[in-house]
Amino acid sequence: MGNCNGASKSNQPDSSRVTQPAAEFRRVAHSSLYGRYNCKCCWFADTNLITCNDHYLCLRCHQVMLRNSDLCNICWKPLPTTITVPVEPTAPPP
């Protein structure tokens, strides 16, 4: 008796979930031909940027968006959840 549907479910991992590549974290933004890179959400931050699909987000805006949903409010694609920090030189090469 009762709900017999609960017993028939299996605990298999969701194989349809696509793993995302790790997003790149930049402490100092690159300077480019068209000016400096900024966070596309708040437009103030130009340090500690995370690469989203085709734009940059600061850590603060990234965390606010992750609290609300898994999608980016700007490009409507999944937000990066894995971040890699590249090794940046602290001094010029000799």
From Swiss-Prot:
Inhibition of host myristoylation by the compound DDD85646 leads to proteasomal degradation of protein Z (and not lysosomal), strong inhibition of Z-mediated assembly and budding, and reduced levels of viral replication and transcription. Interacts with protein NP; this interaction probably directs the encapsidated genome to budding sites. Interacts (via RING domain) with polymerase L; this interaction inhibits viral transcription and replication, Z partially blocks the product exit tunnel for the releasing nascent RNA product. Interacts with the glycoprotein complex; this interaction plays a role in virion budding. Interacts with host eIF4E; this interaction results in eIF4E reduced affinity for its substrate, the 5'-m7 G cap structure. InterPro entries: RING_finger_Z_arenaviridae, Z_RING-type_Znf_sf, Z_RING_Znf. It is a lipid-anchor. The lineage of its organism: Viruses, Riboviria, Orthornavirae, Negarnaviricota, Polyploviricotina. GO terms for cellular component: host cell perinuclear region of cytoplasm; host cell plasma membrane; membrane; virion component. A zinc finger (RING-type) spans 39-75. This is RING finger protein Z. GO terms for molecular function: RNA binding; zinc ion binding. Keywords: Host cell membrane, Host cytoplasm, Host membrane, Host-virus interaction, Lipoprotein, Membrane, Metal-binding, Myristate, Viral budding, Viral budding via the host ESCRT complexes, Viral release from host cell, Virion, Zinc, Zinc-finger. Belongs to the arenaviridae Z protein family. Plays a crucial role in virion assembly and budding. Expressed late in the virus life cycle, it acts as an inhibitor of viral transcription and RNA synthesis by interacting with the viral polymerase L. Presumably recruits the NP encapsidated genome to cellular membranes at budding sites via direct interaction with NP. Plays critical roles in the final steps of viral release by interacting with host TSG101, a member of the vacuolar protein-sorting pathway and using other cellular host proteins involved in vesicle formation pathway.
